[in-house]
Amino acid sequence: GSEMCIRDSCTSMERLLITLILVCTMSNITNAQNPFYGQYHTPHGTVPFDRIETEHYEPAILEGIKLQNAEIEAIIQNPEKADFSNTIEAFEASGELLDKVVAVFGNMLSAETNDDLQELAQKIMPLLSEHSNNITLNEKLFARVKEVYNQKETLQPTQEQKQLLENAYNSFVRHGANLEGEAREEYRRLTNELSKLTLTFSENNLKETNAYQMLLTKKESLAGLPEIIIEAAAETAKSEEKEGWAFTLHAPSYVPFMTYSDNRDLRQKLYMAYNTKCTHDNEFNNIDIVKKIANTRMKIAQLLGYKDYAEYTLKKRMAENSESVYKLLNQLLEAYAPTAQQEYKEIQELAREEQGDDFVVMPWDWSYYSNKLKDKKFNINEEMLRPYFELEQVKKGVFGLAEKLYGITFRKNTEIPVYHKEVEAFEVFDKDGKFLAVLYTDFHPRLGKRAGAWMTSYKDQWIDKKTGENSRPHVSVVMNFTKPTENKPALLTFNEVETFLHEFGHSLHGMFANSTYRSLSGTNVYWDFVELPSQIMENFAIEKDFLNTFARHYQTGEVLPDELIERLVDASNFNIAYACLRQLSFGLLDMAWYTRDTPFEGDVKAYEQEAWKDAQILPVVPEACMSTQFSHIFAGGYAAGYYSYKWAEVLDADAFSLFKQKGIFNQEVADSFRNNILSKGGTEHPMVLYKPVSYTHLTLPTNSRV
């Protein structure tokens, strides 16, 4: 229940780039030095990060655009009648160089960015947006796609071919192919504008986060803080040649400070810094950008014939429409609100015992007093557990879980190039010993890395039609976990252990991918289905049999004691209603921005407070603003999609019941989950995939039963 940024498990930067896919002719430079050209001579053809310089991106992207344009021209000029192979498959296979470069570029913007890269992005993103438009608005190309689509009854396609054809046709229509004249030009203008706005939004967010530090110089200001946090703050200050202790807005610094600091004024100061990000009078202000993004998306949706952006988005989701989303959010609201009120009351009572009867618990008091109450009720807190969650051990535990469930093994390979010295690369092998995937891990905060945690991919899986070769994926998990200090290894909080399991769940979805076509493989699924593989893994975090496989005290080697595990399990539902309401409030805020059918010109903060008022328990802080830093919905793929976490929670709780029933390491259940969900990607409708792993045949708010 900390105020940290919501767990950001955007399954990849591609989502930001889906909307972007090109135009320019200036690049005949076949620069022999450019590592993007030709095959990569690295283990498994991994990205040669050690050879890529900033100046390589632009020429390679321009060249990629040129090549894809030529490939598309060849599809259009083909004298043969349009068919599945010469049109749909040919289009699916186009743009290989471009995809390759954009995957690296997009991922570096999130994980290891700098001013040069950001400046380049301002130039490149509009080009990509324009290229994407040139494809979907290409009338001759669409005519051929439509021709194949209209013969779909006679084609007798396989399930994958059928899905690919549906997706291709829909993708054109959803990106303006049926628009005419003025409307086409307007669509181009709006999408171009949107790509610039979302980019600026996230840059502002990163810069504002990095710009802030609270430097404390008096020892007494540190009252209540655990030693490990004080040490880290001293090292942060020292790294910048400052005296004292520096606290930042990065989660490993911010969250513990809000939880443990006895100094209320300092908690308030740090809270306000975090919760007013991008609202100040400086160049990182996102207030206008929020309005522009919401309004631009609304206009795009209306241009395409929808009432609002949510209707446009949800048409291609399990939820299908706004009504289903509101139905889910409101059901949960009714279920949780009374309990959350009760939780607040208990915390208020505890605070008043200490502070007197007129004390009001404010948002900057919540983590502090809720931690005290948890300690009092369950005799447990994050710091008690931390020594048992040393990062290397946790990694062994998480990899070991995948080995137990799926028989896969992980081998670190230092020959695989990485983009930062803290990143590690692993080869992953299937139970028959065959090479399965490459997995990169990147655990700690850096100035060039955005907040949150996410899984992403450098190369999707697909099967080469000509050779039959199964080209395996390269995926990465990126976190912002507690760093090691001079005299302590990286000791994680329980919350960080859960986050690791969550992102690792996404990575299994990527690594087990087994589809013919790359656009259907891995995490390329309906957005409200994508969180099922990640969230089901979080359930293992409080399973004793799993914790026993790895949780050891980093100094004594002592196993995490049973009674501590029991207290952890007992406490796992502590303040759960408040935490759920918080997620619901973000879902309501998201829907409020994207169910508008008239442009927004009002006050962003007031609108936000109105949108989520039913889910708010704590007193309102008028200066605070979530929207200006809500990257999920303004820069990532979660616009009109934040409810997906809650939607998938219904699914994952149901599917995990099978593990609970048959044993948490049961291989039969694991195999079924792998074969029906993890390896299938987006090759069928999620409801079809989900049926075999369902425990109760639950009913979802759309009324479609599993």
PLM features per residue range, with description:
Residues P484-T499:
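Short pre-active-site segment immediately N-terminal to the catalytic Zn-binding motif
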Residues Q33-P226, E231, A246, F659:
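N-terminal helix-rich structural modules
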Residues H41-H56, F105-I124, V148-R189, T248-D288, ...:
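Short His/Asp/Glu-rich catalytic/ion-coordination signatures at enzyme active sites or charged loops
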